[in-house]
């Protein structure tokens, strides 16, 4: 039964990742905890497997469409590794309830920022804001990129969510990428950061339920293929607004379950 549930939820998670370039961990962590009964630390470790594999498949569509900044994405991803290693080690030392509460707070903050940005864009911002062509790192400065990447990596490792929901806002707000290009490039960063975060959990008390997690990941990869083309059909402002609403919705659900526990 758990494997069947994982297959169903995995497809939905994959569609979100493919369409938005983010959101896999946001959905897989609560799903593994509340639908499949896993411990928060185990769920966060398992979600890194799901997000990393899903991101690999989901990267195909934006790469073909030219919406991936390979140099900036690879640089950002490599710079996030140290933060991911430190964050993963810090995470296992925190109580599961505290981990979820902090996760909820971060979802609220990022969700509000992205929702407001999407609404402002709808009121007249240019859909192509931030050309994203060559050298975003150079335009903003190496220190800003390094700080954003390290911070992203730490939060990725700490919460075990792959980092897409942090990477997309960072690429948009710190590096000036358009939303569609940030979504595509974030998948590359997610692959690097989730791999580093998972490696850092080796030897800790986090356990991955491999049959469930691999079923979840396989279904999510299928969903990622289905979700990729959706990016072409939606405006940048719509994607940004939908992303913010998604984060706030998951935040509300997590807060409700924490208070009801």
Feature roles, as predicted:
Residues 1-15, 34-35, 40, 60-158, ...:
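Juxtamembrane transmembrane-helix boundary motif
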Residues 17-26, 156-163, 181:
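Short helix-coil transition sites and intra-membrane helix breaks within transmembrane domains
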Residues 19, 154, 158, 191-199:
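Hydrophobic alpha-helical segments of membrane proteins
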Residues 28-42, 166-181, 200:
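Interfacial segments of multi-pass membrane proteins
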Residues 29, 53-56, 112, 168, ...:
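Alpha-helical transmembrane segments of polytopic integral membrane proteins
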Residues 45, 73, 183-184, 244:
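Conserved glycine-rich helix-kink/hinge and helix-boundary motifs of the Major Facilitator Superfamily
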Residues 46-61:
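Transmembrane alpha-helices of multi-pass small-molecule transport proteins
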Residues 47-51, 186-190, 212-213, 217:
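Short hydrophobic/aromatic, small-residue-rich stretches within specific transmembrane helices
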């Amino acid at each position: 039964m758990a494997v069947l549930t994982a297959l169903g939820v995995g497809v939905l998670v994959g569609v979100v990742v493919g369409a938005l370039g983010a959101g896999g961990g946001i959905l897989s962590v609560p799903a593994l905890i509340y639908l499949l009964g896993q411990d928060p630390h185990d769920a966060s470790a398992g979600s890194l497997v799901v997000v990393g594999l899903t991101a690999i498949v989901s990267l195909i569509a934006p790469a073909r469409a030219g919406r991936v900044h390979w140099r900036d994405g690879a640089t950002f991803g490599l710079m996030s590794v140290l933060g991911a290693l430190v964050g993963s080690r810090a995470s296992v030392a925190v109580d599961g309830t505290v981990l979820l509460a902090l996760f909820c707070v971060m979802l609220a903050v990022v969700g509000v920022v992205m929702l407001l940005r999407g609404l402002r864009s709808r009121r007249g911002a240019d859909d192509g804001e931030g050309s994203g062509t060559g050298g975003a790192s150079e335009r903003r400065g190496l220190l800003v990129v390094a700080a954003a990447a390290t911070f992203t990596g730490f939060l990725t490792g700490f919460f075990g969510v792959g980092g897409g929901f942090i990477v997309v806002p960072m690429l948009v707000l710190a590096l000036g990428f358009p939303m569609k290009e940030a979504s595509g490039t974030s998948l590359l960063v997610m692959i690097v950061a989730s791999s580093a975060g998972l490696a850092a959990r080796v030897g800790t008390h986090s356990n991955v339920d491999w049959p469930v997690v691999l079923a979840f990941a396989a279904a999510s990869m299928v969903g990622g293929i289905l979700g990729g083309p959706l990016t072409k059909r939606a405006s940048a402002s719509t994607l940004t607004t939908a992303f913010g609403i998604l984060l706030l919705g998951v935040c509300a659900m997590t807060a409700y379950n924490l208070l009801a526990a």
